[in-house]
């Protein structure tokens, strides 16, 4: 399977890859997103093209029911990244105005962060943090780590 949530533009092709030593039986829960139930053998991959209709599509596995993934189809999506364990991430973008957004379990969380990407320098650091949820207690490090590792920041033209 893939990360918990991915945000893509309409028509984007996604590959579901099985890196486990056993098969998975993947399906999309609404049955309306163009993916019929099928066995994904170990080492195999299957392509899926995101619908043209924006929305959230949930994928499950009959073999391992606890596996869940969401594909959010968003027309403004430009890039998707996953943060490291420290919550840091990087990506290459053309100069322009963008909006940074975090997602968790297929839903947008926190506040959008407007960002202006300029021609130079090569690396531009954000000065404002992406607020993706309520502040955690300082002594609650385990929960905070788990929370941030599941967030998926998404860049979109805005």
Language-model segments: residues:
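Extracytoplasmic copper-binding redox domains, predominantly the cupredoxin/blue-copper superfamily
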Residues: 1-147, 151, 155-158
């Amino acid at each position: 399977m893939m990360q918990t949530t991915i945000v893509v533009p309409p028509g984007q092709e996604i590959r579901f890859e099985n890196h486990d030593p056993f098969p998975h039986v993947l399906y999309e829960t609404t049955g309306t997103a163009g993916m019929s139930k099928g066995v994904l053998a170990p080492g195999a991959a299957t392509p899926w093209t995101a619908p043209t209709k924006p929305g959230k599509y949930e994928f499950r596995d009959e073999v391992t029911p606890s596996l869940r993934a969401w594909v959010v189809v968003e027309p403004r999506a430009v890039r998707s990244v996953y943060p490291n364990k420290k919550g840091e991430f990087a990506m290459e973008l053309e100069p322009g105005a963008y909006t940074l957004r975090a997602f968790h379990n297929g839903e947008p969380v926190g506040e959008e962060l407007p960002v202006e990407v300029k021609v130079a320098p090569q690396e531009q650091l954000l000065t404002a943090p992406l607020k993706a949820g309520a502040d955690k207690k300082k002594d609650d490090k385990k929960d905070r780590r788990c929370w941030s590792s599941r967030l998926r920041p998404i860049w979109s033209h805005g």
